[in-house]
């Protein structure tokens, strides 16, 4: 029992129980009916020593409030914690101005000077409302303090409050804006961040204003089948890992047993190169552990049966590599073969280069025609495997390891505005953008474009064009890249009048490209009007535009391609909370119709914002390498089977959107929408993860060395309306993702869930059926496969705290998120 109280200034005073009760009452003001704050105060007092420090008493109140496992407990703990943070930052009760805070950080060399006048700082100060911090959940503030606020990690001094940190991001993003309207844009940007309508990625919070301009944390790249290209891919892996990126790679090297130099050397296959890349990635620390890599391979690869078990703990240790993740790429032809219980033959880029390229094309019919041509060719050596067994084993690997993923590569290349082939995805399989391998590591340092096409026309021999140059083909709306020129087509350079007919294509080279993703997300629950959503979509893309232009590119050629391509990925956050507020289930027709409306609104406003930014700042240099200039919207290529799920209706004029895209010639960005996991944002913004239903109403989340109790927003009043993931079937999940995929030009970090009862097993027929159903509904990806044995009914009603961390016998953390940089966790 406390007798004496030691205040923060060291003064010792007699303990006053009424003040302690008053403190607890203030902590619960506004939601006292949902929490027994008196019990928490009494409990805390009983746990303290006779001489108690103020900080220890506050910590006790916070701990006991959190142990209630309720939303009200989170709010009470957050309110008390906010006072601690403010006193820590301000050094007392008196608040410092933003200018004072920035001066302190600049003197400590943790922040650069921003180009704002004293008058502008004074105006900005009026927009900051520190009282918002006192209405945050505890985990929001803890995540902000521990991960996002600028600090000295040696002395452990924290320099910023939550509102200061958000304003720093907004000020950096708007610093280069037109001076006439800059303050208006800044106010809008800060409002969206502060009111939790817009979620920025971790690199923006950590790096903006520090002079460390690293804003991309995920990248995709391809490795070609030469020693020089392999060396270049190693450099990419190394550089992007120490730049804190999570990686996705398609290594298009030969398979085990393939000939080298006419057969004088036998190729060792992909597995040794996977091991080499693993060593490169893991030798560079990102936070508390090594980097992260997802290797993509074809389901038709001659080594497929060995590649798919690399992560399985039952694989012999000399044949496994559990330190990275793997994604197998399938298409509808392979799945049809699996459904018919037929065999497929295996091939790769070395044995059948044209067939391999067709796998990444837009026409499945063209792939099938070529596949059957090779099958009929007796001179083409073929090894057959059971398509059914291949798919069943792939799905089984997902259940056994949790982190064996699938990508429907034909759907990826069909339902997209990109005209260049998409060869893989990223670490979290939500980014689907074109890549192409480098022929030599020196090309990474080129400050000029490297692609070209040489051809003859009726008028001229040996014409040479940059492969990226826009040309107009007779009969086609808008320009395309010169790399698309074929024999017999009539073309003209953009801006000229005379057409020329191509008589022969002599040589082509695609532009080598590493794809970088710049992310943001919109928290749908907090965008209450169409005007708010439109402005938030604009601010999300405005922020990404800043990142693309101001990022530090460690490899110069990446700057050329990233700024020419201008890829954005804006996702949806807090869908589960939104659905609970609407009292709608993910699995009902009404629920799917609401999800359809949410996805449509998201796509509409982002496309509109891209057009607007294109008008203001110019279209992406490579916009002609997409179909946006031809009026493409997701409605042009989505899988129409999704429309059988519910009587969906449209809320926007999509014909007018297409006309506006044509009139503008596209927009500011080549890619727009991707739905990332959002693991970090769910803590910082008090939102639910991405599109996912809840795993639990309360959960202990770990992040490196930090752990915190997370409770679903408004769980005290909405818990009966939250959909629990474990109570959904995998078909339900496919329906959810299919509805959102309809409106998404890229992909989704699409988790599946399975609760096993006792010795329950999933039949191979069920796995084949549901994998084919994924393809039938237009789903592009399968990310984590979450499974556990539990009482399914209990999960729907009991607030169960679940620890996310699992460590396997190799010492690998299997809990996720894999990417320690949180690049995909906006």
Regions found by a protein language model. Give the residues of each.
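Extended catalytic cores of very large enzyme megasubunits
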Residues: 1-826
């Amino acid at each position: 029992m406390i007798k004496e109280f030691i205040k923060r200034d060291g003064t010792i005073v007699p303990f006053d129980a009424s003040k302690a009760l008053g403190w607890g009452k203030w902590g619960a003001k506004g939601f006292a009916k949902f929490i027994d704050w008196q019990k928490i105060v009494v409990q805390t007092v009983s746990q303290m020593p006779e001489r108690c420090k103020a900080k220890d008493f506050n910590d006790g109140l916070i701990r006991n409030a959190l142990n209630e496992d309720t939303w009200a407990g989170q709010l009470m703990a957050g309110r008390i914690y906010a006072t601690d943070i403010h006193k820590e930052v301000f050094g007392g009760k008196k608040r410092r101005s933003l200018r004072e805070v920035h001066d302190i950080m600049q003197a400590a060399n943790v922040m650069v000077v921003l180009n704002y006048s004293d008058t502008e700082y004074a105006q900005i100060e009026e927009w900051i409302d520190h009282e918002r911090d006192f209405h945050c959940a505890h985990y929001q503030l803890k995540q902000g303090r521990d991960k996002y606020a600028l600090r000295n990690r040696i002395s452990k001094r924290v320099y910023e409050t939550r509102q200061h940190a958000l304003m720093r991001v907004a000020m950096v993003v708007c610093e280069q804006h037109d001076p006439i309207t800059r303050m208006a844009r800044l106010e809008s940007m800060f409002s969206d961040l502060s009111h939790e309508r817009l979620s920025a990625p971790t690199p923006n919070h950590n790096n903006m204003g520090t002079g460390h301009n690293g804003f991309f944390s995920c990248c995709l790249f391809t490795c070609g089948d030469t020693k020089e290209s392999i060396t270049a891919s190693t450099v990419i892996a190394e550089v992007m890992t120490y730049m804190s990126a999570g990686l996705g790679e398609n290594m298009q090297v030969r398979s085990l047993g393939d000939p080298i130099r006419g057969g004088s050397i036998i190729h060792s296959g992909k597995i040794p190169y996977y091991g080499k890349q693993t060593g490169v990635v893991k030798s560079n620390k990102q936070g508390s552990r090594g980097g992260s890599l997802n290797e993509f391979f074809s389901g038709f690869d001659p080594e497929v049966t060995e590649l798919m078990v690399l992560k399985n703990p039952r694989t012999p240790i000399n044949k496994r590599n559990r330190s990275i993740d793997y994604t197998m790429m399938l298409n509808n032809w392979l799945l049809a073969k699996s459904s018919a219980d037929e065999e497929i033959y295996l091939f790769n880029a070395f044995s059948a280069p044209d067939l391999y390229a067709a796998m990444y094309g837009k026409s499945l019919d063209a792939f099938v025609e070529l596949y059957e041509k090779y099958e009929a060719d007796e001179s083409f050596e073929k090894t057959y495997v059971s398509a059914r067994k291949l798919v069943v084993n792939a799905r089984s690997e997902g259940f056994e390891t949790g982190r064996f993923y699938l990508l429907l590569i034909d759907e990826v290349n069909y339902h997209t505005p990109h005209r260049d082939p998409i060869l893989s995805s990223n670490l979290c399989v939500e980014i689907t953008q074109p890549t192409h391998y480098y022929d030599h590591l020196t090309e990474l340092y080129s400050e000029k474009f490297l692609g070209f096409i040489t051809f003859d026309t009726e008028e001229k021999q040996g014409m040479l064009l940059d492969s990226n140059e826009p040309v107009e083909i007779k009969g086609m709306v808008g320009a395309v890249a010169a790399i698309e020129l074929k024999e017999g087509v009539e073309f003209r350079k953009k801006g000229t009048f005379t057409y020329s007919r191509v008589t022969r294509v002599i040589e082509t080279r695609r532009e080598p490209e590493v794809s970088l993703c710049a992310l943001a997300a919109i928290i749908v629950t907090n965008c209450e009007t169409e005007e708010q959503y439109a402005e938030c979509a604009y601010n999300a893309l405005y922020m990404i535009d800043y990142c693309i232009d101001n990022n530090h590119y460690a490899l110069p050629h990446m700057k050329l391609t990233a700024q020419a391509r201008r890829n954005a990925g804006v996702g949806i956050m807090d869908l589960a909370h939104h659905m609970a507020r609407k009292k709608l289930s993910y699995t009902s027709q009404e629920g799917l119709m609401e999800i359809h409306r949410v996805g449509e609104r998201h796509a509409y406003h982002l496309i509109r914002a891209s057009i607007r930014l294109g008008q203001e700042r110019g279209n992406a240099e490579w916009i002609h390498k997409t179909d946006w200039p031809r009026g493409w919207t997701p409605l042009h290529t989505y899988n129409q089977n999704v429309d059988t799920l519910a009587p969906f209706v449209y809320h926007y004029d999509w014909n007018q959107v297409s006309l506006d895209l044509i009139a503008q010639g596209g927009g500011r960005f080549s890619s727009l929408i991707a739905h990332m996991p959002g693991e970090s944002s769910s803590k910082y913004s008090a939102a639910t993860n991405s599109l996912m239903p809840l795993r639990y109403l309360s959960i202990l989340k770990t992040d490196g060395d930090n752990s915190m109790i997370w409770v679903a927003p408004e769980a005290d009043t909405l818990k009966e309306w939250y959909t629990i993931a474990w109570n959904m079937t995998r078909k339900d999940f496919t329906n959810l993702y299919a509805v959102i995929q309809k409106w998404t030009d890229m992909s989704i970090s699409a988790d599946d869930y399975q609760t096993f009862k006792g010795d329950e097993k999933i039949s191979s027929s069920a796995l084949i059926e549901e994998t084919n159903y994924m393809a039938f509904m237009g789903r592009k990806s399968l990310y984590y496969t979450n499974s556990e044995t539990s009482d399914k009914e209990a999960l729907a009603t009991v607030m169960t705290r679940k620890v996310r961390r699992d460590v396997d016998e190799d010492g690998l953390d299997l809990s996720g998120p894999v990417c320690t940089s949180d690049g995909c966790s906006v």
